[in-house]
Amino acid sequence: DRCFNNETSSIIGFPICLSDEFVLTTVIVDFHDEGYAIVRTKDVVDVYSKESDSFNEQICISEGLQEKIHQEYVKEINSLKQIFLQLNDYDGFICIQCEQQLEKCSFYMGKIVAIEDDTVRFKDVGMDGVWDDEVHDIPYEDITQISYGDNYSKMYYKYVSK
């Protein structure tokens, strides 16, 4: 479970990599592959595997979802700059969430334009499938989650003109 602004959300999956700052995990929804998520460890409030989860875990393993831990894109997660350098050549859309702002939670889906020391420059595609004219400078300190490989972003990537 993750918590910010007194809101808790859960990610179900197999952990892949852990650093002092971040955790990379597979994401599984209803026994279906939903890509990968990288979240800040400071937002993680609970990690658990209940006895009742063992049956669900066996289903996921039988469906081959545990094999997703061998993904090739992100191997080191010590800093956001390091993570974005590894995702720079990812053949798909990346989603960035900035959830800690009380007045506005920002969601970006698109491609990395440039990687700076404290920000990532990001080209965003709207929900209408049209590229935003503006390139967004997203400060690392605002980023709460990075995800990729999920069906939502894969469908947009497939149908949005490059």
Q: Model regions: which residues?
A:
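Short beta-strand-centered aromatic/proline hotspots
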Residues: S9-C17, F107-V113
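Short glycine-rich, low-complexity segments
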Residues: D1-S10, F22-L24, I28-K104, G126-K162
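Preference for intrinsically disordered or flexible, low-complexity segments
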Residues: I16-D20, A114-D118, D142
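Extended, basic/helix-rich recognition subdomains
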Residues: M109-V125, G129-V130, E134
